[in-house]
A protein has these predicted regions:
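Solvent-exposed interaction patches of small proteins and small membrane subunits
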Residues: 1-144
Length: 144
C-alpha cells in the first residue's frame, strides 16, 4: 500500500466495521427499532461515521488527484463522479448522504426515522462505494 493511501485504507476499514454493525438492523421493523433507544443510538452513530468516512475518503482522493476543490461535502462526492472515479449516476445517488450526515450531526433533535431507515436499507451503496475506491487505488498503484 502506498503511504498516501494509508488514510484512505483506515477509513475504508472503519466504514466496513460500521456496515457490519448496521447489517443486522436492516431486517428489523422500524417499530422494533423505535422501541429501543440503544438500537437507535447504534444505528445513528454508525450511519454518521459511515457517512463521514465516505466524505473523508472523497476529500482525500480529491487532494491526491488534484481535482477541483469542493464547496461542500455533497459536491466532494459528485466530483468523484465527474472525474470518473465513481460512475456519475452512482455519485449523484450517493451524494445526498452528505446532507444526511449533517442532519445526524447538527439536527439530532429532529431525526426523521423514515430517512434513517431509508439510509439503513441502502447501505449496500456504501459497499459499492468501497469497491470503486479500492479499484481506483489499484489503478493508481499500477500506473506508478
Amino acid at each position: 500500500m502506498k503511504l498516501e493511501f494509508s488514510g484512505i485504507e483506515r477509513r475504508l476499514e472503519k466504514l466496513d466495521v460500521c456496515l457490519k454493525k448496521l447489517k443486522p438492523f436492516r431486517s428489523m421493523q422500524k417499530d422494533e427499532i423505535l422501541k429501543d433507544p440503544y438500537f437507535q443510538d447504534i444505528i445513528e452513530r454508525n450511519l454518521q461515521v459511515a457517512a463521514q468516512s465516505v466524505i473523508d475518503i472523497a476529500n482525500r482522493i480529491i487532494s491526491l488527484d488534484a481535482l477541483k476543490k469542493p464547496r461542500d461535502y455533497y459536491e466532494a462526492i459528485l466530483i468523484l463522479g465527474q472525474a470518473g472515479i465513481l460512475p456519475l449516476d452512482f455519485a449523484q445517488k450517493l451524494a445526498p448522504i452528505a446532507g444526511f450526515r449533517n442532519i445526524l450531526v447538527h439536527d439530532y433533535l429532529e431525526i426523521d426515522w423514515e430517512e434513517v431507515n431509508s439510509n439503513l436499507q441502502h447501505i449496500g451503496d456504501l459497499e459499492t462505494y468501497m469497491q470503486h475506491v479500492k479499484n481506483w487505488m489499484r489503478e493508481q498503484e499500477s500506473t506508478q
